[in-house]
Amino acid sequence: MATATVLSRLSLIPNLSSKPKSFSNKRTTVSVRAQASFSDPFVLQLAESLEDSLSPSSLPLQRIRDSSAESLLSTPWPSRRDEPFRFTDTSFIRYSQIEPVSTQQLNSEILDNLTETHFPNAVIIDGFVSNLTIGPSDLPDGVYFGSFSGLPDDLTNRVSEFIGDFDSGDLFWSINGMGAPDLTVIYVPAGCKVDNSIHLRYFSGQTGDRESKRLPVSNPRVFVLVEEGGEVGIVEEFVGRDEHGFYWTNPVLEVVVLKNAKVKHSYLQKESTAAAHIKWTFVRQEAESEYELVEVSTGGRLGRHNVHVQQLGPDTLTELTTFHMCVNEQTLDLHSRIVLDHPRGSSRQLHKCIVAHSSGQAVFDGNVRVNKYAQQTDAGQLTRSLLLKPRATVNIKPNLQIIADDVKCSHGAAISDLEEDQLFYFQARGIDLETARRALISSFGSEVIEKFPNREIRDQARNHVKSLL
């Protein structure tokens, strides 16, 4: 039979002060740092290979590499004994021969077969921007979209104020910080509304093979800064080069949304069924800002999305709407954390998943923290799961931590197979059982897919999900 685990916690806890962060501009090499106190030889070897694979970089990117090296060297490889990875097995990455991708390789096969898009777009292959398409009227004046190295001096100084100023993530976040070969920047000036969404398409140009266990890893990194009153839509699309490509994509997206600004973030993950995809999304929201994420993920032997959103001002809105679908022997994992620190903040989260394979697993760990001064907060979280095969597994852990006392907060979880009365309703109208099941499964995910703001992305996601049924 299918397996489901729900671990729910609603807690009222005392206020905790955060530990101050310290930064050093001094270059610290991996080998010297490791001699002091390091206990995981595998991570040390990986860190050294990342360092050796990169060429010298600009000062802001070098700061990211230095701080990431420090955190990486104090972090062992995660195991199932670690609570954040309790249900997520990363051992197939650990026991592969990991090879950082060190050079940009223009892949004509990928570029020649790109579908048309009406958006300003960039193709990112192995972390390098390989094809940037922006027409003269695609972006308003003052908007920048491209490599950090191409920023004008005034924007370089402005963007550098925020780079590296995010709370640390886990080991995979640090690996990206050390291994990112470039930084793609999206900058929107104050009061500017970008009508056309900016489309980032990620590919892995190099693939290994499962027999030799050679696993190329790429570390794409994107930074978004939206000034006061600005608005932009961002589409991230991760595409597998072939159905059985063996590689590891380890991306990071950092988003700063200043006062009264809006960001609509669409994320479509269709990696190879043999690949690893571990992504971090960090978001900082100032007062009266809005951040909306819509996600559909179906790819990867292991696919994990870590989302961390920090509300840093009052009257702030956060909305996360996500859909994961397992149709192979795979694990799809969403770890989210929303921190509300100011009055009248609002957050809405809906996560849906389908497990349609007997060796498939879905994981949801959703954390919402309402701190002391976040009075009159309105926070809601709901997760719904469909288990369609015997031994299919879902592990769900909603976690709502409330310190404020004047709030409206709720969370819920539902796990089931298709309802017999719904199937009967279709059959009573002459629709066969298989068609009825497909219709119900498709409609389950449509609630999320229809939230994509762009019709092109909605159609693409809808057709992709239908092809997997």
Give the ranges of each region predicted by the language model.
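N-terminal chloroplast transit peptides
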Residues: 1-25
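Conserved beta-strand/loop scaffold segments within soluble protein domains that form the structured core
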Residues: 2-10, 151-424, 428-431, 445, ...
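N-terminal amphipathic, basic helical "cap/leader" segment at the start of enzyme domains
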Residues: 2-5, 30-169, 173-174
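Short alpha-helical "patches" and their helix-cap loops
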Residues: 22, 105-110, 203, 461
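Compositionally biased, low-structure terminal segments
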Residues: 24, 86-88, 445
